[in-house]
Each structure stands twice: as structure tokens, then as C-alpha cells.
Amino acid sequence: MITLIGKDLAKKGNEFIFYGSVDECENCRFKASCVDSLEKNRKYKIIDVRDNEQKCPVHAENTVIPVEVDRSNITLLSSSKSIFEGSTFSYESADCDEECEYYDYCFPEGLVDGDKCIVLKNHGKHKGECKKGYKLNKLTLGFVI
């Protein structure tokens, strides 16, 4: 999909999380091609940068540029025993309330309950120790859309 992003951020391979639009976007003529194409709280990766700069008062450099984006792969620590490369599943967040050093991997931004995911890579056992005693595997997930 195509969206607009600040010129200084428009680099192939960059990733970002879309947290939603700001008030200034509501009456902008580029709203449909900029923020309306993105889903709030999702992580995206820039796969191509286009030409054709536009003015935008929201970005620091006052310029946006069109980019092609896809949803980013997500790194997840999971205690599931039935996960293998190529398997698909509906994501359900872990039953854990610990705020530990691995929290961002157990509850990664861009992934919400009910997402249909595919395991792209199972990196094996996570070397760190879970405070809840879970045996964790490090996974790279893609999305089934």
C-alpha cells in the first residue's frame, strides 16, 4: 500500500508504528492516501520510496514523500509448544502481568489479539529466564491477511 511519510524518515527498510492521525490531518487533501490507508497501532516497513514531495505542516521538515509499505514482521517470545515454521494461528496475548526485560518481546507493538499469523522462523529456545517460569521460544511472525 502507498502512504505518505516525512521526507527524513522515507528510507527503504525503515520501520514505524502508526499511532494514529493528528487533528491537522482531518481536513488535509492527502488524508485518504496518507493516514486513512494505515491501521492504528500497526508496525509497517518501507519497501519502496517514490518521488513527488508534498507540503505537510505535521512533519518537522514540512515535507512528505510517498512510500510503499507492508506490515512488518514481528518478533515474539511465545510459550506455545505447538508452534513450528509455516504454522498459522490466531494470536492471543500471554497471561502474564510481569513488567520484565522481555515484556516488549512477549507483548510486541503491532500485534493484537485475534491477528492471523504465520511463523516465518522459529529461532529456538530463548536464552533468558522468564520470571513466570515459562519456557519461551523466539519467533519471527508474518501476517495472514
Swiss-Prot record:
Q: Name one Pfam family in it.
A: UPF0179
The superkingdom listed in its UniProt entry is Archaea
Signal peptide from the UniProt entry = none
InterPro entries assigned to the protein according to its UniProt record, in alphabetical order: UPF0179 (IPR005369)
Indicate the family of this protein. Belongs to the UPF0179 family.
HAMAP family assigned: UPF0179 (MF_00498)
* UniProt protein name: UPF0179 protein Msm_0285
Organism of derivation: Methanobrevibacter smithii (strain ATCC 35061 / DSM 861 / OCM 144 / PS)
